[in-house]
Amino acid sequence: MKFTETKLKGCFILEPKIIKDERGYFMESFNEKTFQEGIGQKVTFVQDNQSFSTRGVLRGLHYQCGEHAQAKLVRVLQGEVLDVAVDLRPESETFGQYEAVLLSAENQTQFFVPRGFAHGFLVLSETATFFYKCDNFYNKESEGGILYNDETLNINWNFPIQDLIISDKDKVLPNLQNAKKVW
């Protein structure tokens, strides 16, 4: 597994070693020891989540606050998505900046998003199955979110805005300036 830290300290792109032959392929998708050595910290995952979405679905930008903050290790089992993490750590040099990573079943790339970040994704393929591990349990009272098209963030989703499919809840999320503080 190859680990590459992004411009956002603590966010890592993971590229697995894929062994292919005439039968198909094999890869190790997760190894706790390798993972913790690769990101340089101990993270223990307690929950796995999976979603299925169609082309144009944009989910996010979501996060959990305070003691319920979550780190996530995300990947795509089928299809292709643009995955986005936004730094919400107030003391960070990259506060308010984002990283976008193309995740697909073909490239098998994974993205580690630590605590203190908002997270969202846009489905680029006809359908996509999205899978992620969390290091903390979901807590409804601690959920936060930021509007996907916040002008301060200026995220380039590179997708026709009229074709986006967004939940009513996500359409009315606050902008970064008015969002619930992560800590």
Listing of model-derived features with the role each one plays in the protein:
Residues M1-E106, S125-T127, C134-W183:
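Non-catalytic, conserved peripheral segments adjacent to functional cores
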